[in-house]
């Protein structure tokens, strides 16, 4: 839920106008909107590069994943692994645009540990893939933008730990 929606819901629940503090937070949210959109555009435009480089980093760091018997062994399973990374990158861009982790939490984190466990996929490897995406994606952004985006990657990594 965005800061705007949260503020309105809270104020309405108390049958009051928005407080000066709530209005300041909304102003800050609106002011930072252009930056959040720019970050999401950069990451979306570079998504193939981010996924490819992150996948390469993951497979170098975790060769067990692509070795015979590994969850990403073979062309089809490697493609599935990269598809999952793409899915998480997309969720991160949603969170960045929203200025909130709620889209990541509600769409992608609930049940993720159980799902990967049932598939026999080591969640640590998935988290490592997200770390690799963070490294690639933030290298494409300016310092302030990289810090903003990095927080959403960190949230997802933490949720997987």
Curated annotation (Swiss-Prot):
It comes from the Bacteria. It is a peripheral membrane protein. One of its GO terms (biological process) is photosynthesis. Its main location: membrane. Gene3D superfamilies: Phycocyanins. (2R,3E)-phycocyanobilin binds at residue 81. It holds the Pfam family Phycobilisome. It is found in: Cellular thylakoid membrane. Keywords: Antenna complex, Bile pigment, Chromophore, Electron transport, Membrane, Methylation, Photosynthesis, Phycobilisome, Thylakoid, Transport. GO terms for cellular component: phycobilisome; plasma membrane-derived thylakoid membrane. The modification N4-methylasparagine is found at residue 71. Contains one covalently linked phycocyanobilin chromophore. InterPro entries: Globin-like_sf (IPR009050), Phycobilisome_asu/bsu (IPR012128), Phycobilisome_asu/bsu_sf (IPR038719). Belongs to the phycobiliprotein family. PANTHER family: ALLOPHYCOCYANIN ALPHA CHAIN, PHYCOBILISOME 32.1 KDA LINKER POLYPEPTIDE, PHYCOCYANIN-ASSOCIATED, ROD 2-RELATED. Light-harvesting photosynthetic bile pigment-protein from the phycobiliprotein complex. Allophycocyanin has a maximum absorption at approximately 650 nanometers. Component of the phycobilisome. Heterodimer of an alpha and a beta chain. This is Allophycocyanin alpha chain. It comes from Arthrospira platensis (Spirulina platensis).
């Amino acid at each position: 839920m965005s800061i705007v929606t949260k503020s309105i819901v809270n104020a309405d629940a108390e049958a009051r106008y928005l407080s000066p503090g709530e209005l300041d937070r909304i102003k800050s949210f609106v002011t930072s909107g252009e930056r959040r959109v720019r970050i999401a555009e950069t990451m979306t435009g570079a998504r193939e590069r981010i996924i490819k480089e992150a996948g390469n980093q993951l497979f170098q760091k975790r060769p067990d994943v692509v070795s015979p018997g590994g969850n990403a062994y073979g062309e089809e399973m490697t493609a599935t692994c990269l598809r999952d990374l793409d899915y998480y990158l997309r969720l991160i861009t949603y969170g960045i645009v929203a200025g909130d982790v709620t889209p990541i939490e509600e769409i992608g984190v609930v049940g993720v540990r159980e799902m990967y466990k049932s598939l026999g996929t080591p969640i640590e490897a998935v988290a490592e893939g997200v770390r690799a995406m963070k490294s690639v994606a933030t290298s494409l952004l300016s310092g302030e933008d990289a810090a903003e985006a990095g927080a959403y990657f960190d949230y997802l990594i933490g949720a997987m730990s």
